[in-house]
Amino acid sequence: MDKNIRICIIGGGPAGLSAGMYLEQKGYEKYTILEKNDRVGGKCWSPYYNGRRYEMGAIMGVPSYYAVHDVEEFCGITHDGPQLNRNYKNRLGKVIKPFEPRKNIRKIPRLLKMKRQLRKFGELLETKYKGYDVNGHRGVAEGRYEGFSAASAKREPVSGVNPNLKDLSMPFSKFCEKNGVELVQDIWIGPFTSFGYGYFDEIPAAYVLKYLDFQTCMNFVKINLWTWKNGTQFIWESLNEHLKNPARLNSIIEKVERKDGKVYVTVNGQVEEYDKIIVTSPLYVPKKENRDDGLVGMVDYFDAREDEKKLFSQIEYERYDVLAVETKPEDHPEISYYVFDNMIPRRLGHLMVYYRRWRDDINQVITTYALRKHKRSEEVPYEKCRKMVLKDLETMGNPASSVVNEWSVYYFPHVFSNAYKDGWYDKVEAMQGKYDT
């Protein structure tokens, strides 16, 4: 393809900025990144409090986050943040030790069974489900894999046929039941559901295991974590500064027309002409009466074709809420806490995890995280969820004295099992490049 083509990238989050970096490395330098907000980073948002940055979005990484490491190397930065740790509480606020046999004598048989199932699960993923951790979803519904290996930072291209991969379209809970490893859900749930990715009875196993492949999950379990002193947003600020064409902030896109082999983007009232367009912003946001969250999808401002509308209208997303709160000194938690009891559908809207970022100072905010949507439940209204979380903090013994920041974010776009099984990703892959998009 001609290296002089003009490429428009919509979105200055991790995906959009990374697209610019990889294009630049391949010799494509006529790209423009349009970001509607006054900052880059998307869901990596790290505001300041008392001269230090805290996390309203992404918090941490692990050594198997190879794409993030690509950015670090490109920018000459590294993961230099505070060492995180955590404990656990039940929904009544009592500190528990769910994985320590000596603290749970009655649970020793279950913990031993979990350990056996974990070993079995690792073996199954490497053998029966070979290719499960290959980057991307193409081919999975057809029983094949094609992409880049997650086994090492080299990410060599791999492909192959494995009919068992079709099982990954099942909800993760059913996938575990099918393979006799139900108890591994107790391990995977912490870095999955509490991080906003939904519930195991609704989310296809493919999402769970491609995000949390065995190696990545074990890094979380062993607290082998990366953080950044200046926050995850700093990664993308650094990348933006190193790009030849930094993102143009406060870019409001009003219309996109694709015709006669060109792409016409109306941004801040001006029409700009491109040869290709890359979309890293939401493709579809379901319509809802009285919506005031400002969310729009690609199909709302593009000259969307019928095949695009048909596919993208199957996209769902999570309602994931974050509060940053202050506490009185005597109420400040000594460490971060996970609340497993609240990571199940019937506890929708309750506090799942709350983080203390810095060990050396209590003059900081605590951030809380909650989910408000399950496919078989009514969405919990934002204000109701907010009140529930603040009440939960009281129950935990760490009541908030004030809320200093809050965010409800369009999060984790995905499709459910029927659409996944029907080859949704392969249909989308077949459209790549169509309409110069």
List each language-model region with its residue ranges:
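Conserved FAD-binding subdomain of flavin-dependent enzymes
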Residues: 43, 51-83
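Conserved Rossmann-like nucleotide-cofactor binding loop
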Residues: 15, 39, 284
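Helical element adjacent to the flavin cofactor pocket in flavoenzyme catalytic cores
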Residues: 211-262, 276
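Conserved flavin/dinucleotide-binding core of flavoenzymes
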Residues: 351-437
